[in-house]
Amino acid sequence: MKILIVSDTHRRNENYFQVIEQLGKLDLVIHCGDTEGSEYAISEGAGCETLIVMGNNDFFSKLPREIETTIGKYKVWITHGHNYYVSMNNEIIKEEAVRRGVDIVFYGHSHRPTVEIEKDIIAVNPGSLSYPRQEGKRPSYVCLLYTS
């Protein structure tokens, strides 16, 4: 199963469509929020199932604030992250993920890619394809290959 995880595209979808083309056939796209109204284009461009949550810039959106689902044997929580102060650090969101009993949390908001693997939780922020903030400011995403 090939899964693309993105966040914070902020209606600038050119890099997203390039990544979709480069990766080829996908089984799932997860968007961790801040589409700014372009969720239809993101879903249609994916060519597969798409899970999108609302970010702090998705005003008037009918997107869900959070999604809990499963991928294979893993319980997954998808959130934008702004309600868990991820711009400061990742401790609160990781604590909440453990409290919820999930294995993996996907989140965005900070525009900085991070992957943290700890005993109780895997926390993944794909960064931003449109407005990266990490050193070097390269657009980022995560491609997850899952085999059962």
Listing of model-derived features with the role each one plays in the protein:
Residues 146-147:
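Conserved small/polar residues in nucleotide/adenosyl-binding loops
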Residues 5-7, 28-33, 51-56, 78-80, ...:
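Active-site neighborhood of phospho(di)ester-bond hydrolases with catalytic His/Asp-centered motifs
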Residues 10-14, 36-40, 57-62, 84-88, ...:
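Active-site environment of divalent metal-dependent phosphoester hydrolases
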Residues 51, 87-142:
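Conserved beta-sheet core of the metallophosphoesterase superfamily
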Residues 12-22, 78, 85-97:
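Pre-active-site segment of Zn-dependent metallo-hydrolases
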Residues 1-49, 58-65, 137-140:
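N-terminal active-site segment of His-dependent metallophosphoesterases
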Residues 51-56, 60-92:
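Helix-adjacent hinge/juxtasegments
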